[in-house]
Design a protein with these regions (language model features):
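Hydrophobic ligand-binding cavity/cleft-lining segments
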Residues: 53-181
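A short acidic/glycine-rich loop-to-helix N-cap element
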Residues: 212-217, 242-263
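Short, hydrophobic/aromatic-rich segments at coil-to-beta transitions
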Residues: 166-175, 196-201, 211-212
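Short, highly charged C-terminal tails/helix-capping segments
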Residues: 275-281
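Hydrophobic/aromatic beta-strand elements that line small-molecule binding cavities or substrate pockets
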Residues: 186-193, 223-229
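N-terminal secretory signal peptides
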Residues: 1-45
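Compact beta-sheet-dominated globular domain cores
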Residues: 218-231, 236-245
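Generic short beta-strand segments
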Residues: 202-209, 241-243
Length: 281
């Protein structure tokens, strides 16, 4: 159902019985109003996006910056900003993305490779993590709740995953709620590659992510690959590639900034930093 501005205007006039308007019209008009307030723009990505070439290419990743240098942050929109040659999406399960965000960095941390892997299993540590909000122009708490679960259909907490559980190759699950939604959303976590000096994990949403009853990200349309590589004694290379297959609600640029901020926040949590990302606009 497409709702015009005129329909919403007529329904909201004093001489119109708003309570008698169809419930679906009330809901769509409210959503249109709220979307306008928060600056998300249109309710769907342009249909022309379906005809644009894919974002995934074959360009090799850039070199790691030094551990005392800022992370290299790049993003690609199918019909917008593109920071360099199209990246290789080999770590993701799909290639038909409308948005890609890549983080390349290095950091100093004690421990061996399993210690670094165990950080990804410690999903309860996401709770309270902060990020830079482009819309609010300040740091906010990103995750209000986060914990591991045995199955995506249950909300019963369990202990964080160990490195051994990740190395089993099984698909593991966790839930979290963020600062934009109080709903606990389930995600999958799986070790997809491993060697003596490196590993790669893949994280996906296993159910639709929704806002006011509207789909923001359909199930498995958010894919996030993270690779860690040993570079030397206590020095680790970090590469992540986040892909969104369809931008269902809001302006593409809003999606880009939001997911860029979240991607950087995940690296910051691992590396113990607070990266200044305002300049990445």
């Amino acid at each position: 159902m497409v709702v015009s501005n005129d329909e919403c205007f007529r329904s909201g006039r004093p001489d119109h019985n708003w309570a008698a308007a169809p419930l679906v019209l009330q809901r769509r008009c409210l959503l249109r109003h709220l979307v306008g307030l928060v600056g998300l723009g249109s309710l769907a990505a342009p249909a022309a996006a379906d005809r644009l070439p894919p974002l995934c290419g074959s360009a090799p990743p850039p070199a790691y910056p030094a551990a005392d240098k800022p992370a290299l942050v790049q993003s690609w929109l199918q019909d917008g900003r593109q920071d360099g040659p199209l990246p290789d999406c080999g770590g993701l399960r799909a290639r038909d993305f409308e948005l890609l965000v890549r983080i390349t960095a290095s950091y100093i941390a004690p421990g061996d490779l399993d210690t670094q892997l165990s950080h990804f299993g410690a999903v309860s540590h996401l709770k309270g993590a902060s990020y830079w909000s482009y819309s609010d122009r300040k740091r906010l708490v990103l995750f209000h709740e986060a914990y591991a679960v045995d199955q995506p259909g249950t909300l019963k907490p369990r202990a964080d995953f160990s490195a051994a559980e990740l190395r089993s190759g099984n698909e593991l699950y966790f839930v979290h709620s963020d600062n934009r939604s109080s709903t606990l959303s389930p995600y999958s976590l799986r070790l997809v590659q491993s060697s003596a000096d490196a590993f790669q994990v893949l994280i996906e949403n296993v159910t639709d992510l929704r806002y006011l009853g509207m789909t923001l990200v359909a199930h498995h349309e958010m894919q996030w690959a993270v690779a860690i590589e040993r570079l030397g004694a206590g020095r680790w290379g970090y590469r992540s590639l986040l892909g969104l297959r369809h931008l269902h609600l809001g302006r593409a640029e809003q999606h880009r900034l939001s997911n860029l901020a979240r991607s950087v926040a995940m690296f910051d949590l691992l590396a113990g930093r607070q990266t200044d990302i305002e300049g990445y606009r």
